[in-house]
Amino acid sequence: MTKSELIEQLCSKKPQLSAKQVEDTVKEVLEQMATTLEGGDRIEIRGFGSFSLHYREPRLGRNPKTGDKVELDGKFVPHFKPGKELRERVNFS
């Protein structure tokens, strides 16, 4: 599902809201989540899951085009861990 598909579905479920209101709300929720993760904080949505940052250690990689070894810096990557309710819904559907 893309962001625009999500907005369309929400508009059809909540016809009293304009498409612009729904779009602005979805964008704001995603922006707040990104800002929270950018600040190094964790996001927990009970029943759905949690978003956090995992650190990837520096490592030696390889350029697939040339085969040369390349040093890769350490970095933080977003990580999602599904909650129990979401795992159960996915496994029983």
From Swiss-Prot:
InterPro entries: Hist_DNA-bd, Histone-like_DNA-bd_CS, IHF-like_DNA-bd_dom_sf, IHF_beta. One of its GO terms (cellular component) is chromosome. GO terms for biological process: DNA recombination; regulation of DNA-templated transcription; regulation of translation. The keyword Transmembrane does not apply. GO terms for molecular function: DNA binding; structural constituent of chromatin. Keywords: DNA recombination, DNA-binding, Transcription, Transcription regulation, Translation regulation. Belongs to the bacterial histone-like protein family. Heterodimer of an alpha and a beta chain. This is Integration host factor subunit beta.
